[in-house]
């Protein structure tokens, strides 16, 4: 499979400003606020100018029940902190209450997370983007009829089901420290989805992901698990990730990839026990991207939230093929990043319990399993089902050039590299002084000038100003409805 280094690819990004308002409860390690921190940091790095930004639709119950059971989704829609006493039996049945608490807006949170992932899949299917990013997604532990590991609705499974409408084979890769059990379980008996998970194994949540778990029935050999021990570092991780993924690509030949970028595999994570730096983690993104396949990048775990924001901001830059400085720009959460206020983190001095012998032994066992695969299974031709999200209306080319563009349209536009330069005050990598960046008036063709008598009149400076683009800062929190 062809690999390319440093190829610029079109990126779209899903974010809803409300996502940071949801709160799992006091002392709970899962903090949706980290998504807002990530968004704010990448805004202040100026990355928003290089990609299309969309606000996800809220996925409805019908979309969710493409995988989840009806009664489970009905329960999630109904349960609230003030009526929990009425649902005590169902809470037990659906594993809601402790790790997966009931909180205000629980179902809306699931709708946003799922909406972004499903909309991303539709965008990729329509070839309207090369890479889609939804940091609010990646909730890989949720089961068909059960919440698990802080996850309620499995947005990944729903996004993959959407991709399967257009793609014969979809590859799922999971670099979260926890095993991607919910996704593996959903596709355990099919040969159209291969799941590959690199995770901590042995007396660690969720307890699954043994090397010998390889799939069943038609899906035999289509589940790949790389069990790891504490303290794995960048060098060891790269030494296993690249050869395993190269072999998987060669044997499975997917036409789309979903990458779950859980950042709890970073050094210093509140719940994790690996020793990866942000650069080491992002090398996985870079390597998968080099295969030049339609790619969905999702969030997942990550409980030292300042490092989550650092990691996902940097990985957004990697997707955009953009270098960003190590010096963090000033942002709304600047004090979180002290005392160094730098983007990158250093590894700790913890011992890497993954010896070269251990890693090599596991790698060879996985290679043996991968050799059992028939090369790229075929799929019977069928009519393509309807998309989960209706076609967007409106053609940009038909917009009236004399009308000020909406903020939604502004967010969707990607700035040319030459269109902006840093203001003197900000320096490299800083936010731009929006008053310095105005869009030139559209130049009319000779034919249009002939038809438009007004064009022959002299246009005053004041009239020109009305044609100018809205200020760049308007993009900050207003994002396009997907």
Swiss-Prot record:
The modification N6-methylated lysine is found at residue 432. Zn(2+) binds at residues 176, 178, 264. InterPro entries: HDAC_PDAC (IPR050284), His_deacetylse (IPR000286), His_deacetylse_1 (IPR003084), His_deacetylse_dom (IPR023801), His_deacetylse_dom_sf (IPR037138), Ureohydrolase_dom_sf (IPR023696). Keywords: Acetylation, Biological rhythms, Chromatin regulator, Hydrolase, Isopeptide bond, Metal-binding, Methylation, Nucleus, Phosphoprotein, Repressor, S-nitrosylation, Transcription, Transcription regulation, Ubl conjugation, Zinc. Residues 390-482 are annotated as: Disordered. Its cofactor is Zn(2+). Gene3D superfamilies: Histone deacetylase domain. It catalyses: N(6)-acetyl-L-lysyl-[histone] + H2O = L-lysyl-[histone] + acetate; N(6)-acetyl-L-lysyl-[protein] + H2O = L-lysyl-[protein] + acetate; N(6)-(2E)-butenoyl-L-lysyl-[protein] + H2O = (2E)-2-butenoate + L-lysyl-[protein]; N(6)-[(S)-lactoyl]-L-lysyl-[protein] + H2O = (S)-lactate + L-lysyl-[protein]. The modification S-nitrosocysteine is found at residues 261, 273. Pfam families: Hist_deacetyl (PF00850). GO terms for cellular component: chromatin; cytosol; heterochromatin; histone deacetylase complex; neuronal cell body; nucleoplasm; nucleus; NuRD complex. Residues 401-416, 443-482 have a biased composition (Basic and acidic residues). It comes from the Eukaryota. Residues 390-400, 417-427 have a biased composition (Acidic residues). It is found in: Nucleus. The modification Phosphoserine is found at residues 393, 406, 409, 421, 423. The active site is at residue 141. The modification N6-acetyllysine is found at residues 74, 220. Part of the core histone deacetylase (HDAC) complex composed of HDAC1, HDAC2, RBBP4 and RBBP7, the core complex associates with SIN3, SAP18 and SAP30 to form the SIN3 HDAC complex. Component of the nucleosome remodeling and deacetylase (NuRD) repressor complex, composed of core proteins MTA1, MTA2, MTA3, RBBP4, RBBP7, HDAC1, HDAC2, MBD2, MBD3, and peripherally associated proteins CDK2AP1, CDK2AP2, GATAD2A, GATAD2B, CHD3, CHD4 and CHD5. Belongs to the histone deacetylase family. HD type 1 subfamily. Histone deacetylase that catalyzes the deacetylation of lysine residues on the N-terminal part of the core histones (H2A, H2B, H3 and H4). Histone deacetylation gives a tag for epigenetic repression and plays an important role in transcriptional regulation, cell cycle progression and developmental events. Histone deacetylases act via the formation of large multiprotein complexes. Acts as a component of the histone deacetylase NuRD complex which participates in the remodeling of chromatin. This is Histone deacetylase 1. It comes from Rattus norvegicus (Rat).
